[in-house]
Design a protein with these regions (language model features):
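Bacterial Sec-dependent N-terminal signal peptides
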Residues: 1-27
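N-terminal carbohydrate-binding accessory modules
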Residues: 41-45, 61, 304-374
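Substrate-binding clefts and catalytic carboxylate motifs of secreted carbohydrate-active enzymes
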Residues: 45-68, 84, 184, 188-191, ...
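Beta-strand-rich binding/interaction modules
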Residues: 132, 230-272, 279-282
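Hydrophobic/tyrosine-rich beta-strand signature of extracellular beta-sandwich/beta-rich modules
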Residues: 165, 254, 303-305
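Surface beta-strand/loop "capping" patches
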Residues: 205-243
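Substrate-binding/catalytic cleft of secreted carbohydrate-active enzymes
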Residues: 368-371, 381-524
Length: 524
């Protein structure tokens, strides 16, 4: 029997491409990042989609990790994949929970020889194991953040190679969210439900922050200070690794382009990295009369980043879209954007990433369409309830002008076993590393939603956030009634619980920013 999601994904993608929007011309095509960046030609870096043609099996099966396993009778699916067809009314935990297997056959291109290869899954639901040619390379716990594997030493050229993935979305209290699905307010729809990429580049390269595990480091980190209509200070941090056999000397070059592809800023800094080592390089640059990002004018620049050797050869490079803006929460003086009090109503909503029929396995176009419809409805704030959402949704919020509250996975559950807290802390670090360059990020919610946790937990998560984002315009929010709320500069209130808003204005702390998060259940 053929996998039923193939038909429904085709229908949905066609509908998304056929739909028109009021903001953009009919021929407009959204731009989606790949693993956090956009490709540039002639940089030695190539991105391959690994989405097509995976063999799929629902259930446990012995020996499926072995490269010689016979999978010819399995269904053929493409990613994103959500395991199964779901009815339009899919609440009540009727989705499948358990092991599923994916296997992909491919032959590496000869041009990959002498380069580095990283396999990048944007997310795999639950706990997962990844094998390449029968070798177990990765075990991961958690369903909402990237899973990245260095496959360079394990590929065989000129012959069939096999990636095998076992994904298990069964209830497991050892990692967040942790709560059994039958008591949860969302579902653990399973599978490899986001995009998968093979990233090929030279052995001297800009790293991936989610792979490197460097506090406030890895990859590219762009932060701002002293933002005004007259000028803005950019702090540019790039983490470069040298996996070649020789020391590297060269430079990092930054070029900033406006919406019309005019170069408005250029900056370079020298770089030397010994073989087998990595180095964080930092510099600052000032842009005069910048176009500032806001919900009503979501202006995006393109920041090109190149690694060049001493002969000016480009060794690696890509670009990111950045928006120059400042966000400040000033207690009783309210929210300020770009140095001025924000004059418009901050109307928003919670958003879950699932959809009728396909569960969590949305194509990028559907994430973008969701953001478009929400913005067209007059919303300016989206809360990613209750987990980091697809990179395509974050890209859309950058482009369409939606503030985003980024949440760590968690909902009304705590496990006293130390491994649970360690995995929460890891999720917080990795969601910041993934999303820190998005101008749409309004604040972070690094706390477990509506959860009773140990007294020191709240302080720990705020400390981790500030370690990972040690620059201006970084804020954390939590419920006003949450344990440890005194460590947070922003408190979420609810009119009917006596916790804030207009119902107890005399007791409000003037240093705290209060935001009425919900007027009713899940309605902002």
């Amino acid at each position: 029997m053929k996998h039923p999601l193939i038909f429904w994904k085709t229908v949905l993608i066609c509908l998304m491409l056929a739909g028109k929007t009021g903001t953009y011309a009919d021929n407009y095509q959204p731009s989606y990042s790949t693993a956090g960046f956009y490709s540039l030609s002639n940089t030695g870096r190539t991105i391959y989609s690994m989405n097509p043609a995976w063999r799929f099996h629902k259930g446990n099966i012995k020996g499926a990790e072995q490269s010689g396993f016979n999978d010819k009778s399995w269904d053929v699916v493409s990613l994103p994949d959500g395991i199964e067809y779901l009815p339009t009314e899919a609440s009540g935990c009727i989705n499948y929970q358990g092991e599923v297997w994916y296997r992909k056959h491919f032959t590496p291109e000869q041009s990959w020889k002498g380069k580095q290869q990283f396999l990048h899954f944007e997310a795999i639901m639950g706990k997962s194991k990844i094998w390449v040619n029968g070798k177990l390379l990765k075990e991961h716990f958690g369903g909402f953040l990237p899973v990245i594997v260095d496959v360079t030493p394990y590929l065989n050229y000129g012959e069939d190679n096999v990636i095998a993935v076992c994904a298990d979305n069964s209830d497991d209290p050892s990692y967040p969210p942790g709560k059994p699905q039958d008591a949860l307010d969302f579902a653990y729809f399973g599978g490899i439900y986001r995009d998968c990429w093979m990233i090929v580049h030279n052995h001297v390269f800009i790293t991936d922050p989610n792979y490197e595990n460097e506090t406030a480091g890895g990859g590219l980190f762009v932060s701002f200070d002293k933002v005004s209509e007259q000028s803005a200070l950019l702090k540019l941090d790039a983490h470069i690794r040298n996996n070649s056999e020789k020391s590297f000397s060269g430079k990092i070059v930054y070029e900033l382009y406006d919406r019309n592809d005019n170069r408005v800023l250029s900056k370079e800094t020298n770089l030397s990295v010994n073989n087998g080592k990595a180095k964080q390089s930092s510099c600052k640059a000032t842009i005069e009369t910048p176009h500032l990002w806001s919900p009503d004018s979501p202006y995006l620049y393109k920041l090109h980043v190149y690694v060049k050797d001493r002969a000016e050869n480009i060794i690696d490079g890509y670009y990111r879209r950045i928006g120059i803006r400042s966000v400040e929460f000033k207690g009783k003086d309210g929210f300020w954007l770009n140095g001025k009090p924000y004059p418009y109503p901050l109307i928003g909503a919670n958003r879950h990433q699932d959809y009728a029929v396909i569960g969590n396995a949305l194509p990028n176009s559907l994430h973008w369409r969701d953001a478009k419809k929400l913005r067209d409805a007059g919303l300016r704030v989206i809360r990613n309830a209750h987990y980091p959402q697809d990179p395509a949704f974050m890209d859309a919020c950058d482009e369409l002008g939606l503030f985003v509250i980024v949440n760590t996975p968690g909902w009304q559950f705590w496990n006293d076993e130390p491994i649970f807290a360690q995995r929460v802390f890891s999720d917080i670090r990795n969601m910041v590393r993934r999303d820190r360059n998005h101008p749409c990020v309004w604040m972070w919610e690094p706390i477990l939603n509506e959860t009773w946790y140990p007294a020191d937990f709240a302080k720990n998560v705020v400390d981790i956030l500030n370690e990972e984002y040690p620059y201006p315009y970084c804020y954390a929010g939590c419920d006003v009634t949450a344990r440890g709320h005194e460590y947070f500069p922003i408190h979420f209130t609810h009119p009917i619980n006596g916790g804030g808003g207009a119902f107890n204005t005399e007791s409000l702390d003037p240093k705290i920013s209060y935001y009425t998060r919900e007027w009713g259940d899940n309605v902002w």
